[in-house]
């Protein structure tokens, strides 16, 4: 109900303010500013009321806490409720609340008394010990305990019997006595075996003498092998020098021998007339019939036929402008590419 009355009041004040704003715009042709509102106190009061009511309505009311039913929850530890500003209490001194009978005898109050009996100041008082002496004795006691526990000793299976005093006649002389340790002294560190510089140099020289000869032999063999290999390489280079050839840039084609068709081979031959040739033939026939020697005929034919020039066989010359040729057989044939 309170909210409804507030909303009604806000709407009524808003209507009055809007009415005044419209009138002001109609008369002055501009909206009112803050200074114009302050000049009219009634309108300023209405604005103030309007903004206060608006702010109160915008605040949301807090929700009321609802009580939780603890029947359906696990039990929790109940802590004592203490206020936040409450400081913790100081611890109480129990000696102030104790009766004199139960008071510790070592406790002395303002007046020295023990079980309601006044004490003398020098009674039951122990002398003050020096703190420095106590510290030294504690240190010695601790070091003795540490030294006894540092050396580990194993328990012996057959414990030695209690030593009894033997007569001096049966005792071993002191020169032959040896001290036997039951357990090794782990704290003692054996010093490493040290050598002098001269001994180390002597050992190095002995090692060099032993192994130096072998090294020299190996070096000589290696040098001889390297020199022989270099000489062989030099000889091979001299005997077979490497030459860089230009790569062939044209196609290799094998052609047959060129035929020289010029008649230069006929220049040295004598001219033969047909009449003389016929007459020579007649004479040859008569001489052949007379001599009847076939060997001479074959020899004359070879002389006439086998005149070789530029691969051509020349026969008998018929005339000055004509000569017979016989081509030799070719040894290879040109393949077409």
Swiss-Prot record:
Location of this chain's protein in the cell: Cytoplasm; Nucleus
Keyword terms: Cell cycle, Cytoplasm, DNA replication, Nucleus, Phosphoprotein
Xref: InterPro entries: DNA_rep_checkpnt_protein, Sld2
Coiled coil residues, start to end: none
Residue numbers spanned by region Disordered: 71-97, 258-302
Record's comment on post-translational modification: Phosphorylated by cdc2 at the onset of S-phase.
Biological process (GO), any one: DNA replication initiation
Signal peptide range: none
Top-rank lineage group of the source organism: Eukaryota
PTM-bearing positions, type Phosphothreonine: 60, 74, 99, 154
Entry's Gene Ontology cellular component terms: cytoplasm; DNA replication preinitiation complex; nuclear replication fork; nucleus
Modified residue annotations for Phosphoserine: 87, 183
Feature: compositional bias, Acidic residues: 270-285
One MF term in the entry's GO annotations: DNA replication origin binding
Effect of residue 87 to A: Decrease in phosphorylation by cdc2; no interaction with rad4
Effect of residue 60 to A: Decrease in phosphorylation by cdc2; no interaction with rad4
Disulphide-bridged cysteine pairs: none
PANTHER family: DNA REPLICATION REGULATOR SLD2
Family: Belongs to the SLD2 family.
Subunit-structure text: Interacts with rad4.
The name this protein goes by in its record: DNA replication regulator sld2
Gene: drc1
């Amino acid at each position: 109900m309170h909210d409804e009355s507030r909303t009604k009041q806000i709407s009524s004040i808003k209507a009055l303010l809007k009415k005044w704003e419209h009138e002001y715009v109609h008369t002055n042709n501009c909206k009112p500013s803050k200074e114009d509102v302050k000049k009219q106190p009634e309108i300023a009061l209405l604005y103030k009321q309007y903004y206060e009511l608006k702010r109160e309505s915008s605040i949301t009311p807090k929700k009321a806490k609802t009580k939780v039913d603890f029947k359906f929850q696990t039990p929790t530890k109940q802590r004592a409720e203490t206020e936040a500003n409450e400081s913790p209490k100081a611890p109480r001194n129990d000696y102030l609340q104790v009766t004199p009978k139960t008071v510790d005898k070592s406790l002395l109050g303002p007046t020295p008394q023990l079980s309601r009996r006044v004490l003398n100041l020098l009674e039951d008082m122990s002398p003050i010990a020096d703190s420095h002496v106590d510290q030294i004795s504690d240190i010695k006691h601790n070091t003795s305990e540490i030294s006894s526990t540092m050396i580990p000793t194993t328990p012996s299976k057959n414990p030695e019997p209690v030593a009894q005093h033997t007569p001096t006649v049966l005792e071993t002389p002191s020169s032959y006595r040896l001290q036997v340790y039951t357990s090794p002294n782990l704290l003692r560190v054996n010093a490493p075996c040290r050598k002098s510089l001269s001994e180390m140099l002597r050992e190095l020289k002995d090692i060099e003498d032993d192994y130096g000869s072998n090294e020299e032999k190996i070096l000589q063999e290696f040098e001889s092998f390297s020199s022989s290999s270099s000489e062989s390489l030099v000889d091979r280079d001299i005997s077979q020098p490497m030459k860089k050839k230009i790569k062939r840039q044209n196609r290799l084609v094998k052609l047959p021998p060129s035929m020289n068709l010029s008649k230069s081979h006929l220049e040295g031959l004598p001219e033969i007339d047909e009449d003389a040739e016929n007459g020579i033939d007649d004479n040859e026939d008569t001489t052949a019939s007379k001599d009847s020697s076939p060997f001479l005929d074959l020899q004359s034919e070879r002389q006439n036929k086998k005149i070789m020039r530029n691969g051509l066989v020349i026969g008998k010359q018929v005339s000055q402008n004509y000569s017979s040729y016989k081509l030799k057989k070719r040894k290879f044939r040109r393949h077409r590419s």
